Amino acid sequence: MKKLFFSLCLACFVLGTAVAQLKTPEQFLGYKPGDRFTPHHRMVDYFEYVAAQNPNIKLIQYGETNEKRPLILAILASPENMARLEQIRTDNLKRTGLLSGTPSTQVPINWMSFNVHGNESVGMEAAISTFHTLADPNNAKVQEWLKNQVII
């Protein structure tokens, strides 16, 4: 009976760990980014999937294309920085002189832009891979980076 209980606990742990792993772009899309053109809706699907897995990611639709495709940005931050996102934003405006006052935080905002022209696919492919790297909660180096900055 103890062996059966132990086996069940071990199976639950292994399955729970496997489920908790973030799918890579290749696993999600069925091909490695850059090997094929990724349609816009699949990129949005992947960003939404990753954001649903990680509470430290916020997706914002800031507009749409002429073809009514959503234009989105992803905000990645540590839990502490995500909780004070508005303060960090206004402090950055104060540092640039766009708002008056003295900043109370020293957290920079790192804006990463990938696409300038809609018909150039390399930016979207790079964005998908970079987003996965930055969103992976098991990447200790990135988690350390996110303590010191907000990435958009």
Regions found by a protein language model. Name each.
Residues 1-4:
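Positively charged n-region of N-terminal signal peptides that target proteins for export
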